[in-house]
């Protein structure tokens, strides 16, 4: 069945309190998607972000981002008073997230909510909370990790005292006793996060909207995952990485990309029958309806750079687990529900892996306009319907911003191919050819629908600061744009069967 939808991260939803949340505006967006005839909502990783604010660098592969908890919902639950959060100036410009202000104020407000939550329990743990803790065994390690980070002034676990860094049994036991209340606070945050998330997901599903989630291939070094299971990563005896992940120099980057993530010990993971990955994918498939796996080609082969290197020069390619991993994942978690982000160097070996896995790959229109007309990303050259076409992604400029930075020859080719005369017509033309392509799924962004330029870009890869900040406003979700998309979706044979609308929370 042909489908289509919008890529819009939770953080980018409108909201008075600094960042998009799983509150009223998220439900309004589901309603807007339904009115626009859409069946897919794609988001970025829901993970708790670390100091760079990137959802692809998280303190845990399991923990949700507490910033997405709706403060208004907590007020409805009796855990907050309105003035306790409404009187705070969360941001200067509603178009952009101010992460410094969020960090300064959010956890203070949540401590107030936690205090009331703890008192309301009166020593008797609610059945819902008890069930949540029992169903999520990762919570204990994660909450201890966060409590210890607080105790160490936010420092990476790599800088903690030796006994805790190496997870000495006695030291860990003592820390759990000492920081029990702080661990409870972080467990409370996760309880509220997932409580709100699954209610929102159910509402979306009840209204015919599937959620496409996203998981990074690698963990951050400063994460509970690496701290707790160092044997699964290429670390030395002192838990220092021997090699880190990245990408070699190419036409787009003279020094390559130095991501800095520790690399998996794939031999050890295979010995454990990929237990860690099966657990991760099982969790992701519960969290989302469809899972996009970032940097899929890294499972075929990965680029390893010596730890401490300043650039990506001098790294080496090594074989990844290839289909062996995905064969186990399919057997243990089911066959479907995965999108492979297969952008990059597509070798015959990568093509073989994609064919074996049978996951849909990605086609990004901004890569399509080689003046020869032979690009595999150009819709006329698609050889399979088993793919997802994107007008742009979180790592690219908007269609308009991209076009404005092209050379004159390529601009002319784009105009001729799309049949447009002016740059302002480009975003709609991109959406049109994506929707009318043979790809099973077609995705665009709110930036494209609104015709925004580079000012609305979410992320510039390999740069630090000023990323992941852009947000929508209520005024962006117009009846006119919904009607346009609804009609295009209908004539493109992507419109889902009509379902009776479900009520909000």
Predicted features along the sequence, with ranges:
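N-terminal regions that are enriched for targeting/export leaders
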Residues: 1-11, 27
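Alpha-amylase-like alpha-glycosidases and glucanotransferases acting on alpha-linked glucans and related
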Residues: 9, 15, 53-190, 194, ...
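Catalytic domains of carbohydrate-active enzymes, especially glycoside hydrolases
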Residues: 24-49, 286-288, 434-436
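Surface-exposed amphipathic alpha-helices with a cationic face
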Residues: 34, 197-205, 330, 354-355
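Outer-envelope exported proteins of Gram-negative bacteria
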Residues: 44, 210-212, 216, 290, ...
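Conserved, well-ordered alpha-helix/loop/beta-strand core segments that scaffold catalytic motifs
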Residues: 186, 190-219
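C-terminal accessory segments of extracellular proteins
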Residues: 483-495
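Short Lys/Arg-rich cationic patches that frequently serve as NLS/NoLS or arginine-rich RNA/DNA-binding motifs
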Residues: 497-505
């Amino acid at each position: 069945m042909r489908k289509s939808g919008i890529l819009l991260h939770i953080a980018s939803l409108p909201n008075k309190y600094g960042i998009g949340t799983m509150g009223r505006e998220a439900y309004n967006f589901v309603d807007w998607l339904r009115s626009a005839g859409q069946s897919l909502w794609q988001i970025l990783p829901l993970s708790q972000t670390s100091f760079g604010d990137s959802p692809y660098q998280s303190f845990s592969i399991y923990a949700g981002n507490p910033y997405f908890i709706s403060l208004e919902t907590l007020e409805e639950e009796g855990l907050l008073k309105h003035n306790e959060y409404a009187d705070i100036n969360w941001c200067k410009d509603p178009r952009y997230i101010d992460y410094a202000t969020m960090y300064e104020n959010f956890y203070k407000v949540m401590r107030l909510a936690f205090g009331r939550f703890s008192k309301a329990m009166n020593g008797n743990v609610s059945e819902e909370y008890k069930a949540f803790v029992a169903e999520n065994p990762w919570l204990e390690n994660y909450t201890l990790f966060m409590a210890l980070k607080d105790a160490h002034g936010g420092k990476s676990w790599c800088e903690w005292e030796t006994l805790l860094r190496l997870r000495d049994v006695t030291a860990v036991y003592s820390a759990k006793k000492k920081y029990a209340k702080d661990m409870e606070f972080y467990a409370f945050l996760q309880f509220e996060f997932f409580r709100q998330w699954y209610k929102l997901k159910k509402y979306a599903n009840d209204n015919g909207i599937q959620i496409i989630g996203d998981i990074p291939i690698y963990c951050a070094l400063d994460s509970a995952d690496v701290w707790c299971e160092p044997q699964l990563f290429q670390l030395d005896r002192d838990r220092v990485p021997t090699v880190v992940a990245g990408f070699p120099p190419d036409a787009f980057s003279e020094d390559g990309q130095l991501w800095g993530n520790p690399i998996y010990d794939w031999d050890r993971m295979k010995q454990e029958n990929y237990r860690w990955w099966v657990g991760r994918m099982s969790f992701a498939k519960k969290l989302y309806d469809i899972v996009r796996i970032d940097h899929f080609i890294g499972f075929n082969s990965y680029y390893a750079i010596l730890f401490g290197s300043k650039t990506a020069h001098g790294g080496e390619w090594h074989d990844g687990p290839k289909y062996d991993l995905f064969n186990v994942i399919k057997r243990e978690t089911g066959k479907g529900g995965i999108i492979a982000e297969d952008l990059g160097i597509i070798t015959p070996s990568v093509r073989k892996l994609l064919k074996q896995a049978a996951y849909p790959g990605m086609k990004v229109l901004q890569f399509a306009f080689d003046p020869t007309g032979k690009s595999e990303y150009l819709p006329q050259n698609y050889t399979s319907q088993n793919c997802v076409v994107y007008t742009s992604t979180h790592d690219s400029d908007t269609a308009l911003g991209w076009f404005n930075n092209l050379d004159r020859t390529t601009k002319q080719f784009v105009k001729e191919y799309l049949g447009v005369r002016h740059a302002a017509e480009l975003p709609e033309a991109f959406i049109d050819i994506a929707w009318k392509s043979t790809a099973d799924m077609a995705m665009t962004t709110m930036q494209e629908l609104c015709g925004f330029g580079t000012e609305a870009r979410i992320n510039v890869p390999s740069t630090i600061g000023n990323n992941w900040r852009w947000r929508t406003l209520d005024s962006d979700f117009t009846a006119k744009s919904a009607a346009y998309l609804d009609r295009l979706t209908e004539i493109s044979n992507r419109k889902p069967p009509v379902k009776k609308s479900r009520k909000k929370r």
